[in-house]
Amino acid sequence: MAKEEPIEVEGRVIEPLPNAMFRVELENGHRVLAHISGKMRMHFIKILPGDKVTVELSPYDLTRGRIIYRTK
């Protein structure tokens, strides 16, 4: 069984939560819970409220995601 491709969407960080989790509002108005990807943790990339980010969502659970890029 082939793994389905993740969905990439743009959003803005609303609030930081414990354990490197963030509440992100997507461009379409939906709010998701997102965590930082491993590479971003390794390179100590800081994410603050108001930052524009790219979020990767699983097609199986559209309420949770992974932050994969922070736009300047």
Curated annotation (Swiss-Prot):
Keywords: Cytoplasm, Initiation factor, Protein biosynthesis, RNA-binding, rRNA-binding
Principal location listed in the UniProt entry: cytoplasm
InterPro entries the UniProt entry points to: NA-bd_OB-fold, RNA-binding_domain_S1_IF1, S1_domain, TIF_IF1
Domain S1-like as annotated: residue spans: 1-72
GO cellular component: cytosol
SUPFAM superfamilies reported in the protein's UniProt record: Nucleic acid-binding proteins (SSF50249)
MF GO annotations: ribosome binding; rRNA binding; translation initiation factor activity
Compartments, as annotated in UniProt: Cytoplasm
PROSITE patterns: S1_IF1_TYPE
Function summary: One of the essential components for the initiation of protein synthesis. Stabilizes the binding of IF-2 and IF-3 on the 30S subunit to which N-formylmethionyl-tRNA(fMet) subsequently binds. Helps modulate mRNA selection, yielding the 30S pre-initiation complex (PIC). Upon addition of the 50S ribosomal subunit IF-1, IF-2 and IF-3 are released leaving the mature 70S translation initiation complex.
Family assignment from sequence similarity: Belongs to the IF-1 family.
Subunit structure: Component of the 30S ribosomal translation pre-initiation complex which assembles on the 30S ribosome in the order IF-2 and IF-3, IF-1 and N-formylmethionyl-tRNA(fMet); mRNA recruitment can occur at any time during PIC assembly.
Protein name: Translation initiation factor IF-1
Source organism (scientific name): Syntrophus aciditrophicus (strain SB)
